Swiss-Prot record:
Residues 168-421 form the MHD domain. This is AP-1 complex subunit mu-2. One of its GO terms (cellular component) is trans-Golgi network. It is a peripheral membrane protein. It comes from Mus musculus (Mouse).
């Protein structure tokens, strides 16, 4: 997840500035970067990530400079690239134009900025307004030590101000998972993934430190100790308040939170999910006469759970008219501007099976049908339930005044892009 070192190279690949953050990659490895880049250019397969043995180079180009991060691990590439672009943005605010000459003329400031921007390979202070409060440019010299260190730095957080007070200290935690599903007309699952977020609503006084623990199914997989019944999270992204260095060491999610609402983390699971609401449909079209539609919906989740606000959208021909419906539960309505029937079920318990029949008339002169038929779409929300099994095991709230705070946890599984194709 972290970068080992960061280099700034000139147009010929010669290092102008380098900062070794972790010491696990020899600094001489950068000598392989430019030959690899030129080789890829000749082959016409240029990529933003190059590899030499076990070392990976993640790079961007700005003006006549290359910014390169090296790593040995399976790093969070999006985080590293975001850091490189943010570094360019910060340098441009300091030097107006970022090019070889501005790096050479201000190398002292560049080194100081690199020390503040990243710590042990993890992005740290990337807010240019905070950096400019205590790393100031006067000519080519760095002015330090005279002015007081700004409050945002002593607090080590730019996202939370001091002096926040609440009569009642509470934290609300929402674990929300969206299920993306695509099933073909034969009933085979083509795409199945879970996109999850953990959102917090924080009403806490002072400058508290929070520690969030997830259940062992998650932690064991992340630390490589589990072999089965585990949840392998992909594309894990944290809010900037999370201490990434600690998470990298022991998987503890430790942070000083912003005040109010924010997204603590997001993740993705590319795993075969059993469709929570399974749809079987028969659509029969009788030429110049009518369309008969039969849709069967089954809840394939635990019986003690209930899906709320279920909406099943069934496509119908654009020239259909005179709709008639019969449902075993809920209600159906025709939405002609979208060419769909929407079957609404307020409460859908797990293990239950329901039926909807629809009858439409067709004109005697048929309109030309567009190739392919839109899929059936399903919307739903299941409270107190996560598909992955992720759970919040504990939330510790530590604040110097020692007040007691109440954490509240809510779990929600909902439909994302949930589609089933029809034949």
């Amino acid at each position: 997840m972290s970068a080992s070192a960061v280099f700034i190279l000139d147009v010929k690949g010669k290092p102008l500035i380098s900062r070794n953050y972790k010491g696990d990659v020899p600094m001489t490895e950068i000598d392989h970067f430019m030959p690899l880049l030129m080789q890829r250019e000749e082959e016409g397969v240029l990529a933003p990530l190059l590899s030499h043995g076990r070392v990976h180079f993640l790079w961007i180009k700005h003006s006549n400079l290359y910014l390169v991060a090296t790593t040995l691990k399976n790093a969070n590439a999006s985080l590293v690239y975001s850091f490189l672009y943010k570094t360019v943005e910060v340098f441009c605010e300091y030097f107006k134009e970022l090019e070889e000459e501005s790096i050479r003329d201000n190398f002292v400031i560049v080194y100081d900025l690199l020390d503040e921007l990243m710590d042990f390979g993890f992005p740290q202070t990337t807010d240019s307004k905070i950096l400019q409060e205590y790393i100031t440019q006067q000519g080519n010299k760095l002015e330090t030590g005279k002015s007081r260190v700004p409050p945002t730095v002593t607090n080590a957080v730019s996202w939370r101000s001091e002096g926040i007070k609440y009569k009642k200290n509470e934290v609300f935690i929402d674990v929300i998972e969206s299920v993306n599903l695509l099933v073909n007309a034969n009933g085979s699952v083509l795409l199945s993934e879970i996109v999850g977020t953990i959102k917090l609503k924080v009403f806490l006084s002072g400058m508290p430190e929070l520690r969030l623990g997830l259940n062992d199914r998650v932690l064991f997989e992340l630390t490589g100790r589990s072999k089965n019944k585990s949840v392998e999270l992909e594309d894990v992204k944290f809010h900037q308040c999370v201490r990434l260095s600690r998470f990298d060491n022991d998987r503890t999610i430790s942070f000083i939170p912003p005040d109010g609402d924010f997204e603590l983390m997001s993740y993705r699971l590319s795993t075969q999910v059993k469709p929570l609401i399974w749809i079987e449909s028969v659509i029969e079209k009788f030429s110049h006469s009518r369309v008969e539609i039969m849709v069967k919906a089954k809840g394939q989740f635990k019986k003690q759970s209930v899906a709320n606000g279920v909406e099943i959208s069934v496509p119908v021909p654009s020239d259909a008219d005179s709709p008639r419906f019969k449902t075993s539960v809920g209600s159906a309505k025709y939405v002609p501007e979208k060419n769909v029937v929407i079957w609404s079920i307020k409460s859908f318990p797990g293990g239950k099976e329901y039926l909807m029949r629809a009858h439409f008339g067709l004109p005697s002169v048929e309109t030309e049908e567009v190739e392919g038929r839109p899929p059936i779409g399903v919307k739903f929300e299941i409270p107190y339930f996560t598909v992955s099994g992720i759970q919040v095991r504990y939330m510790k709230i530590i604040e110097k005044s020692g007040y007691q705070a109440l954490p509240w946890v809510r779990y929600i599984t909902q439909s994302g892009d949930y589609q089933l194709r029809t034949s």
